[in-house]
Amino acid sequence: MSKIQNHQKVVLVGDGAVGSSYAFAMAQQGIAEEFVIVDVVKDRTVGDALDLEDATPFTAPKNIYSGEYSDCKDADLVVITAGAPQKPGETRLDLVNKNLNILSTIVKPVVDSGFDGIFLVAANPVDILTYATWKFSGFPKEKVIGSGISLDSARLRVALGKKFNVSPDSVDAYIMGEHGDSEFAAYSTASIGTKPLLDIAKEEGVSTDELAEIEDSVRNKAYEIINKKGATFYGVGTALMRISKAILRDENAVLPVGAYMDGEYGLNDIYIGTPAVINGQGLNRVIESPLSDDEMKKMTDSATTLKKVLTDGLKALEEK
């Protein structure tokens, strides 16, 4: 590990609900000695920095301040949460044109600063914006990671934990594919305490229809939260903290993320949700899950959906 040193610096671009939740999670964990907040609304970044620094006596010493894109020059990690929020009744893919425009104004000044660290992207539609960040930046694919299905997989583990009366962190299960409506639960590889989930479900009389209902509830949970409180932010903010921790502490942790496909699952030239090894160099390698035939079809269909929207979105951006 050559880039990550004892003094670690993170720059957050986008200080909305997700960004500020991520910043608070990072402050709580004491991860990174220097944390910079960048947003077009300068007063908010100053206010958040002042508010967050008041948490440091209870957590760990940290220099938190409002900054500019030039502060990215010596950063280890740049986290992008900036973008138009998802509104009630709106899908993540509906956001593509608005947020591709916003992203195009972010990546260039970050790169122009001399930044050579790792990008972590969370703005929606995250798989498409992660791919666009990779394209706009010219960075190696390993140094651009999406939050992908990290939050969705957490939601699945919460739901399965409730169903089978175990702690969510004892459930080894992944949502895969798009972070969005074409995502799916990879039940064939899921387990609890090394025992296959499908075997446990059969023994406990949990039907395939019930498992499908759990999958649907996970897929639609964001819409439920958005309809009730306007946005989701605590879960994704914590998921971003976990990925950041794996990078900054060089953990070689297997996490659900949005990763570039280079032949895995028969896919190429796309970012999509899968387990992967994350360390100080970024995305070390994809863990290609042994999906069932039905799940493999869902993965392919999800990629097809993403590629069409990605192609149309980038074309529209070029025509502007």
UniProtKB/Swiss-Prot annotation:
A GO molecular function term, named singly, is:
L-lactate dehydrogenase activity
Residue sites binding substrate per the record: Q86, R92, N124, P125, V126, D127, D152, S153, A154, R155, T232
InterPro entries per the record?
L-lactate/malate_DH, L-lactate_DH, L-lactate_DH_AS, Lactate/malate_DH_C, Lactate/malate_DH_N, Lactate_DH/Glyco_Ohase_4_C, NAD(P)-bd_dom_sf
Question: Can you supply a Gene Ontology BP term from the record?
Answer: lactate metabolic process
Asked if the record carries the keyword Glycoprotein, the reply is no
The domain of life is Bacteria
Pathway recorded for this protein? Fermentation; pyruvate fermentation to lactate; (S)-lactate from pyruvate: step 1/1
Record: active site: H179
Concerning Pfam families, the annotation shows:
Ldh_1_C, Ldh_1_N
Q: Name one GO cellular component term.
A: cytoplasm
* The protein's role, per its UniProt record: Catalyzes the conversion of lactate to pyruvate.
- Its protein name is L-lactate dehydrogenase
What species does this protein belong to? Pediococcus pentosaceus (strain ATCC 25745 / CCUG 21536 / LMG 10740 / 183-1w)
